[in-house]
Amino acid sequence: MSENRLAAKLTKVDKAAILLLSLGETDAAQVLRHMGPKEVQRVGVAMASMRNVHREQVEQVMGEFVEVVGDQTSLGVGADGYIRKMLTQALGEDKANNLIDRILLGGSTSGLDSLKWMEPRAVADVIRYEHPQIQAIVVAYLDPDQAAEVLSHFDHKVRLDIVLRVSSLNTVQPSALKELNLILEKQFAGNSNATRTTMGGVKRAADIMNYLDSSIEGQLMDSIREVDEDLSGQIEDLMFVFDNLADVDDRGIQALLREVSSDVLVLALKGSDEAIREKVFKNMSKRAAELLRDDLEAKGPVRVSEVEGAQKEILTIARRMAESGDIVLGGKGGEEMI
């Protein structure tokens, strides 16, 4: 088999994994230091799954790297909480720990950036007794899924205050970021260089709300509506909910269905409106659609929480696919969310 055909089977993430596995630990750490937690997690997954890589593939990847060495590649997303686990599977516990330590202690990671590598509960503990505005800045700085998990470790009153503050954030002055980094760097190494940073806002609040459990999301939205009805409307307009899947194009729905198990799909559709059901049926084979209809009819009563859980699972998959460019989503107000 030719080198080109071998390399053609590799994704960009696979090639990145091969490249890093070919480097020494120190050099790999230098490369990974310039990636975010999600990028490292995805490369770590690829490294863990590498089996029987041909010498020709390694040579081809190296050759391509030399040709495009000046380019930057965005590697997509994954779950932050599993980074250490995935790197351990890929490299072994000692090497994974050394690699992560080098990334975090290498001198280019700010205190805020270090929080992205921590478990959500640990982040919540770090900021629990800080001023509410500091809590809001930290939550706005995190990726929406991690931010939502951090919020879940606070009581409702604190969650409401943080989300309202995130919604009103626009830009953060360098002096404020520098002070916050200094506070955090008492525990984490890094530098405190800062530029005027855009973070927060209604869109960020909506993104975070999207990742909250349904019960927390509903309670929080009700409270926001009581405080500021106009703001709650703006947030809702930018949120993406299950019924919005009816507006996703056919190719996107087909791609999404390939990633969703039939059991989860049946549960999710039990609580959906007719438009989303027809959208799903339309994008399945005739036989598969008939089987799904039969499963829906045969399915007995289910708890609302089970339906909401299944819908959240599908939405999580959809958002991940949107962030990697596989599908395009739109919020209630039709604004594009990539």
From Swiss-Prot:
Query: Would you kindly state one Gene Ontology biological process term found in this protein's UniProt entry?
Result: bacterial-type flagellum-dependent cell motility
Major place of residence: membrane
In what way does this protein cross or attach to the membrane?
Peripheral membrane protein
Where is this gene product found?
Cell inner membrane; Bacterial flagellum basal body
- Where is the short sequence motif Part of the EHPQR-motif located? 130-133
Task: Please give the GO cellular component terms listed in this UniProt entry.
Answer: bacterial-type flagellum basal body; plasma membrane
- Signal sequence region: none
Keyword Translocase listed? The answer is no
Q: Which family does it belong to?
A: Belongs to the FliG family.
Recorded hits in PANTHER family, A to Z, give: FLAGELLAR MOTOR SWITCH PROTEIN FLIG
Which protein, by its recorded name, is this? Answer: Flagellar motor switch protein FliG
List the source organism: Pseudomonas aeruginosa (strain ATCC 15692 / DSM 22644 / CIP 104116 / JCM 14847 / LMG 12228 / 1C / PRS 101 / PAO1)
